[in-house]
Amino acid sequence: MSLRCLYLDLDGTLLGRGASMLHDGEGRVSIDGVRAIQACLRGDVEVVLMSGRRSTQVQEDARLLGQSSYIFEGGACVVLEGEAQWLTGELQPGEMTIAEQIERSGAPGMLLEHYSGRLEYHEPWHTEREVSHLFRGLLDVAEADRLLAECGHGGLRLVDNGVVSRRSEALAELPHVRGYHLVPASASKAGAVAFHRRARGYAREETFAVGDSREDLACAAEVGVFWLVANAISRDPSIAAEIAAHDNVRVADGANGTGVYEAVVATLMTG
């Protein structure tokens, strides 16, 4: 069966240091990410970017790759041929954005107060978001989700988006810092991948995905093959324990764009 679509994460996966497509994770010049996209386009494989980034950012990145569909804010919305499909359950944009509705609920403030010294907004990327509230820090996501439910915010969940490099002095004592998205409970990258795949009429076996986080890894349930880039393991060894839950996950030898190129070539050759 021929391959028809790649679902591809941006930060920490296709992009290297400084969110550059032309540099690896160490800042060295690399065109492997470009070669990966080129291989897909030559093979008539659609590339759907999936990211926690804001819509305007992912839209421009998709346009630069010649693609008309993309997934933004951690799966909260799928844009298909220019039409937004919100996967946010009862929370829908209207007079207020979904992010404003979440703010009004009090959930973000509750989390910041409860996890004082362990959680803060991920400045400067936390503004102008349509859906999610973006934090950084270090906490137990399962515990945070239980706290949300106990405080009447069961319609929301906190998503672990992996290790991040920036922090303020308030978090200086933490051993490392992770990025977190507060989103409607129904929003996920896996759900967005499933929606797009059904809309396009792709069989699961006709698709594959590449990423670097637990949220990305959950997409394995919706694609034929899922690849983790090598830096996913080196930056967060604990993610390796979750691979066993899937029988279609492979780990690339290469990091960032080099790992993406490895995944694309290997999958196209065997697909």
Where are these regions (language model features)?
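Short, flexible loop segments at the rims of nucleotide/cofactor-binding pockets, characterized by
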Residues: H23-G27, V47-L49, A185-S186, E205
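Glycine-rich phosphate-binding "P-loop"
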Residues: L14-G27, V177-P184
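Active-site phosphate-binding/coordination module
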Residues: R28-W125
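Charged, glycine/proline-rich intrinsically disordered loops and linkers
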Residues: W86-S105, V159-R178, P237-A244
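Asp-based phosphoryl-transfer active-site loop
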Residues: R4-H23, L49, A220
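Mg2+-dependent phosphoryl-transfer enzymes with acidic/Ser/Thr/Gly-rich catalytic loops
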Residues: S2, S30, V183-A185, A190-G271
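Conserved acidic, metal-coordinating active-site core of Asp-based
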Residues: E113-E222
